[in-house]
Structure formats: C-alpha cells, structure tokens
Amino acid sequence: MLILLLHAVVFSLPYTRATEACLRACPAACTCSHVERGCSVRCDRAGLQRVPQEFPCEAASIDLDRNGLRILGERAFGTLPSLRRLSLRHNNLSFITPGAFKGLPRLAELRLAHNGELRYLHVRTFAALGRLRRLDLAACRLFSVPERLLAELPALRELTAFDNLFRRVPGALRGLANLTHAHFERSRIEAVASGSLLGMRRLRSLSLQANRVRAVHAGAFGDCGALEDLLLNDNLLATLPAAAFRGLRRLRTLNLGGNALGSVARAWFSDLAELELLYLDRNSITFVEEGAFQNLSGLLALHLNGNRLTVLSWAAFQPGFFLGRLFLFRNPWRCDCQLEWLRDWMEGSGRVADVACASPGSVAGQDLSQVVFERSSDGLCVDPDELNFTTSSPGPSPEPVATTVSRFSSLLSKLLAPRAPVEEVANTTWELVNVSLNDSFRSHAVMVFCYKATFLFTSCVLLSLAQYVVVGLQRE
C-alpha cells in the first residue's frame, strides 16, 4: 500500500509542477489551465489593445479572440516551443509585421478570420511556420495575396479564405502539394483559369460557391486528380467547356446548382465514373443531351429540380441507369408519351416523386404518376391531349356559359339603348289625336276624353316595356 502511495506521489509531481508553471506566467487579463499537452491560455473578450508581453513557456493553445488588437510586431509572442494553436479572430488587425510568428516552431493551427481591416499580407508573413497545417483567413477583406505567400508552408492541409475580395483564384495556391481542403466562398471570384490550381495533387475538397464565376477554363482542374468534392453552386455559369472536369476520376460530389446553365452536355461528366451526388438544380436547363448521364451508374442522387425542363429523354441515361434518387420537382413538365418511361420507372422504383404536369391541358395539375397513357388500335401510346380530342363526340361547340357579370352587362346595354322617351311618345300621340279630332270634337268633354286616352296609351307603353325586360331576363 505504501509503495502504491509513493508511486502516485512521484508521478503526480510533473503534473503539479506544470500546473504551477502555467499559472505563474499567466497574463493578468487571461485565464490559464493545464491540459494534456501543456497549458491552455484564454484571453478572449479581455479588452486587450496589444498582445501580452509574456505567456507560459508550456503554452499549447492561446485564444485572443474578440479583442482590440491592431498590429502584430516582430516575434509578437516571444518563443513558445510548445504552442500548437493560436487564434486571433474578430480583432482589428490592420498590419502583421513580417516575422510576427517567429519563435513558434510547432504551430499547427493559425486563425486570423474576421479581421476586416487586414486587406494586405506581406510575402514573409508566415515565414518559419513549417509545421502549419490549418490557416484561417476568412472575412479579412483581402484584395489579393502575394504569389509566394504560402510557399514556406509545406505542411499546409486546410486553407479557409471565404468572404474576401480576390476576384480570381489566388496564385499562391500553386504548388501546394499537400493541401487537401480549400474554401473560397463569397470571394467575388470571376473565373477559374487553367493554371490556377497547378500542382495541387492531393486536393480533396474545393469550395467556390456563391462567387461570380462566369467561366471555367478547359483543364482548370487537370492537376486535381484526387478531388472528391467540387462546389461551384450559386455562380453565373451559363455554359462549360467539354473538358471542364476531365481527369476528376475520384470526384464524388459536384454541385452546379444555382447557375445559368441552359443545357446539359454529354461531354461534361464523361470522366466522373465515381460521382455520387450531382446538383444541377436552380438553373435554366431546357435540354439534356442524349447520354449525358450514361457513365454515372454510381449516382446516389441527381438534382434537376427548379429548371425549365418540359421533357427528359430516356436516352439521357443510356446505356445504363442509376439506382439513386431523382429530383425533378419545379419544372414545367409536358406529360405526354415522351415521359411514359419516367412514369413507369416512378411506379417501379419509388425513387422519384412530385413530377407535376404543366401540360397538356387535360392533365395539367396532376402528378405524372396519376397520368393514364392509352393505346391506339396499333398498340402505340396516345398523348393525353390527342386522346381527349379523338374520343369526344363531334357536334356543335356549346355556347359559353354567361356569367352574372356578362348577363347584367348585356341587359344593361339593352336597357340603355336609345329609345323614344315616354313623354315624346305621349306628345306624339296627343298631336295625332289633335289632328284627327280637331275638326269635329272641340268641346271641353272631348278634350277630357283625349287626356284620358293619352294616359291609357302611355300606360300601355310602360307595360310593354316591362314585359320586354322580363322576356330579356328569361332569355339570358
């Protein structure tokens, strides 16, 4: 028992000494704690305007996020042989002196994201960081970076640089033979040139989504044979060269959604035998070339939703057909005999749904799965609109049913048509009576009789007008 106790005391001494050393050199505005591989120093949200002058020698991780740091001088962190992670995100850095990170020989992760005033980096900014594996430069509003900025980072595996102002893929990427992941989202990149990714033979994931890419040059990804995920969605691509993706035989995900593509060419995907996810959604596609998907037998999902497709030919998938999911919703489908194969495949596989018909009129609004394709006497498929025409009995076209508004308008126009006013009719009648009776009846009694006759005649006219209105309503 005594031996075990002595053993525990002996082995706990290094841990106790390391903890004491960590706490002894901890900056006043920071908190320090001992971790497995050294000391963790947290100085985030401490209101710091400059980097503390001293850190624990055993520091393995330093967090200086969300302070007010503006400038990093040379050897800004002294000599910290055990430091592996340094985070300076969300500060106000505007300048980093060349050699600022000297004295950090084991640094593997450097985070400089969200320093919007940085804008520029000297070619020697990251000198002496030979073991750096992860570099985060996101949201620094960088316009450009020197061609050899990353040349002294042979171990770099992951580069995050989204939300910048590059306009083109930085030439600093060339020759980064060990880089595996690169993120350039929302960086206003306008084109992917043929030489911008030279030497990147281990690159597995490249994200260029939400940029302004209008052109991808032929062979642009020629040196990226290990690429598995390529994201080009939400750009301005209207077309692609035939050899745009040539050589990407390991590609598993290709996202071209949210562009301006009007058609899908057969040559685009000829080398992508390992492709599993293909996104062509939210384009303006109206035509898919025959055999466009013929080599994609390993697809798990094909997204064609949100386009302008009216028909999709079986020949687009020949000679084989994939067994994955097919997304076709939000297209103006014409559900005639050209889509009978798709209806049959929907019933048999259950891997596609929500194919709403926009035409012909007899099936508009229905789902393709509900459309019944009849057969002619020769056994040929009959389009729904043709079926509707040939089976209808000939006869005169029925008159359109009048609506309440049309009936009222018609009646009103008839009532308002020019007619002799009742007063004019009465006056005319009175004049006629006067002419005919003027010579023989001139007594007061005769005049009274004429007044009564006029009243009677006027009443008859009004009664006739009322009958005309009633008959008009009945006919309408």
UniProtKB/Swiss-Prot annotation:
Single GO cellular component term: extracellular region
Domain LRRNT: 19-57
UniProt cross-references to Pfam families, sorted A to Z: LRR_8 (PF13855), LRRNT (PF01462)
UniProt-annotated glycosylation sites, renumbered to this chain: 92, 178, 295, 388, 427, 434, 438
Keyword Signal among record annotations: yes
Main localisation: secreted
Keywords: Extracellular matrix, Glycoprotein, Leucine-rich repeat, Proteoglycan, Repeat, Secreted, Sensory transduction, Signal, Vision
GO biological process per UniProt: visual perception
Signal peptide: 1-18
Tissue expr: Expressed abundantly in retina with lower levels in brain, lung, spleen and testis. Not detected in kidney, heart or liver. In the retina, highest expression found in the inner nuclear layer and ganglion cell layer.
LRR repeat windows: 58-79, 82-103, 106-128, 131-154, 155-177, 178-199, 202-223, 226-247, 250-271, 274-295, 298-319
InterPro entries registered for this protein in UniProt: Cys-rich_flank_reg_C, Leu-rich_rpt, Leu-rich_rpt_typical-subtyp, LRR_dom_sf, LRR_TM_domain-containing, LRRNT
Domain LRRCT: residue ranges: 331-383
Protein location: Secreted, Extracellular space, Extracellular matrix
Protein family (similarity comment): Belongs to the small leucine-rich proteoglycan (SLRP) family. SLRP class IV subfamily.
Disease link: Defects in Nyx are the cause of the nob (no b-wave) phenotype which is characterized by a decreased sensitivity to light and an absence of the rod b-wave in electroretinograms. An 85-bp deletion in exon 3 results in the loss of 288 residues from the C-terminus of the protein.
Name this polypeptide is given: Nyctalopin
Originating species: Mus musculus
Species lineage: Eukaryota, Metazoa, Chordata, Craniata, Vertebrata
Gene: Nyx
